[in-house]
Amino acid sequence: MKKILFALLICFCIVAKSSYAGTCNGGVEFQGAVNGHTYCRSNSAMNWWTSFGWCKKQGRELASIDQLCDNWNGVSSDNVCPNMMVALDAWSWSSNPSGTYLAFSVNLSSGKLDMAHYRITGAYAVCY
């Protein structure tokens, strides 16, 4: 009986680990303040293109505006993304471009949504 229970416990651990969405090596996991989803923020700032690769390396994807900001109203201003008001004082990239040279970014403490140039290395990757 003990062997059967031990085998079931091992199987459960393997299944639980394999169902996990990805890793967060070189980053910090956090929960969305509104939706409770798990995100991974890089420990290093990087440009927009590098953010895609960093998330892919984690087995995840660079989060879109819809994944970051529930019920976004299309406006770029303060407090439009309460889901990202998580006290990590940093700007983060979204996967959404805005025009030819810009991408949407979100401040992880104020919930402010703005745009930044693709090449700027002052924002962090946030993966979903």
Predicted regions and their residues:
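Residue-level detector of bioactive/disordered segments in secreted/extracellular proteins
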Residues: 13-15, 26, 42, 57, ...
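Intrinsically disordered, low-complexity segments enriched in glycine/proline and serine/threonine
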Residues: 5-6, 20, 70
